[in-house]
């Protein structure tokens, strides 16, 4: 029997999932510090045009994720988590290779489409976590998963910024090596976590994005939680979508400074998720913890909308760490409303919602920023995206307060 056939309680199961999510996050964040100047160099574009190109790039990546996420989630329910995660890792490695070789804006966009297609592994990865943890422990474990994502946000942008001195594409070669190493690790040591009796045939109706949404619509309380998650996803995307552009337009930061700023945010959020999330959820409950996190996030968004100095920006990076309560709390609320056989589909639904939010985000956040940093704008206001994010978060808080309190299926 191969190591892959080992029991799901094998310590390699959770370890591999954490590394995979870390690499997914790193792949998402790797390009952030170098993206503005990479687009300006490759496309010979001014900053406002590069912001606009970045919006189209984000839309293409989000559309790919929107399609792929529920497919991967349902495939993981039918085939098991192991096969789907290994395929996604192979695709992630291909994505890094394309970005490393990119010599045009079109190639960069194509590389980000691959990121969207194979970044949908977040859903199957979370489903694997649900397979091997009890319902009462899931909020804490999802907090650890979110911490892995936060660490990826540290490693990705920091690596992108630090290696940018060796060229725009150097970070992608480093990430390619890491992705291939994790693929080999999973191929040999990652066990299957989904029991055969809990698998179900692949369904095209469930695998399309709107079929996944029907799952939420049919379950008590799940629809509103899904809508809250969608609003939160749109608002929280203000950082990955606009931060690098905002830092250049508002504060004149270098690629290295942008990478270090992402690293600081990632460190504070990861520490918060490890040491605060589990305790806060147990003390406050999932709903109240999510509300508290969103209130802190909205205050941070307003602060960045008005920020005019590096010192204030640095202080806000530490203060916004409380937003780490939101994602794991909402994910735990969704997971509680699904049975064991639905966990892959529910996590696919969550990933689909994130993909849909990523489609809305570039239009709602990045496009206005491109306008308010262009010569045609009546005022120069790079912080417009943060102001919009604050309003969206306030709407999410209001909607969550109306969600039924039932916590089980």
Regions found by a protein language model. Name each.
Residues 67-80, 272-286:
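Helix-to-loop junctions at the C-terminal end of transmembrane segments
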Residues 111-150:
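Cytoplasmic helix-loop-helix junction between adjacent transmembrane helices
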Residues 287-330:
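C-terminal transmembrane helical hairpin of 12-TM major facilitator-type secondary transporters
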Residues 34-51, 241-258:
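Short amphipathic helix-loop junctions that connect adjacent transmembrane helices
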Residues 48, 164-177, 367-391:
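A membrane-interface helix-boundary motif in multi-pass transporters
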Residues 66-105:
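Conserved MFS/SLC helix-loop-helix module at the cytosolic interface between two early adjacent transmembrane helices
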Residues 183-189, 387-409:
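Multi-pass alpha-helical transporter architecture, strongest
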Residues 2-11, 191-228, 250:
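Juxtamembrane intracellular "pre-TM" segments in multi-pass secondary transporters
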């Amino acid at each position: 029997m191969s190591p892959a056939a080992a029991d799901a309680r094998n310590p390699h199961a959770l370890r591999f999932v954490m590394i995979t999510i870390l690499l997914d996050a790193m792949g998402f964040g790797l390009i952030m510090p170098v993206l503005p100047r990479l687009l300006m160099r490759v496309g010979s574009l001014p900053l406002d045009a590069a912001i606009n190109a970045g919006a189209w790039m984000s839309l293409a990546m989000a559309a790919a994720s929107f399609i792929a996420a529920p497919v991967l989630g349902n495939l993981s329910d039918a085939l098991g988590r192991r096969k789907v995660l290994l395929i996604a890792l192979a695709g992630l490695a291909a994505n890094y290779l394309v970005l490393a070789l990119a010599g045009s804006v079109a190639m960069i966009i194509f590389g980000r489409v691959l990121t969207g297609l194979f970044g949908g592994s977040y859903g199957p990865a979370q489903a694997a976590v649900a397979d091997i943890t009890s319902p009462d422990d899931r909020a804490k474990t999802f907090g650890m998963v979110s911490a892995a994502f936060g660490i990826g946000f540290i490693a990705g942008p920091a690596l992108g910024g630090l290696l940018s001195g060796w060229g725009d594409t150097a970070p992608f070669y480093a990430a390619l090596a890491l992705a291939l190493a994790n693929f080999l690790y999973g191929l040999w040591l990652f066990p299957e976590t989904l029991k055969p009796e809990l698998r179900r045939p692949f369904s095209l109706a469930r695998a399309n994005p709107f079929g996944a949404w029907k799952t939420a619509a049919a379950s008590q309380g799940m629809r509103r939680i899904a809508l809250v998650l969608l609003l939160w996803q749109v608002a929280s995307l203000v950082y990955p979508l606009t931060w690098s552009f905002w830092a250049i337009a508002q504060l004149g930061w270098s690629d290295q400074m942008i990478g270090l700023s992402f690293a600081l945010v990632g460190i504070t959020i990861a520490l918060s998720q490890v040491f605060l999330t589990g305790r806060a959820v147990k003390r406050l409950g999932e709903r109240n913890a999510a509300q508290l996190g969103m209130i802190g996030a909205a205050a941070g968004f307003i602060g960045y909308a008005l920020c005019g100095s590096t010192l204030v920006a640095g202080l806000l990076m530490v203060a916004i760490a409380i937003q780490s309560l939101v994602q794991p709390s909402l994910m735990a609320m969704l997971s509680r409303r699904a049975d064991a056989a639905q966990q892959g589909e529910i996590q696919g639904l969550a990933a689909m919602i994130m993909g849909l939010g990523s489609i809305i985000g570039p239009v709602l956040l990045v496009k206005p920023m491109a306008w308010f940093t262009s010569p045609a704008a009546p005022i120069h206001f790079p912080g417009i995206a943060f102001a919009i994010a604050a309003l969206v978060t306030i709407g999410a808080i209001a909607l969550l307060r109306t969600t039924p309190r039932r916590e089980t299926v």
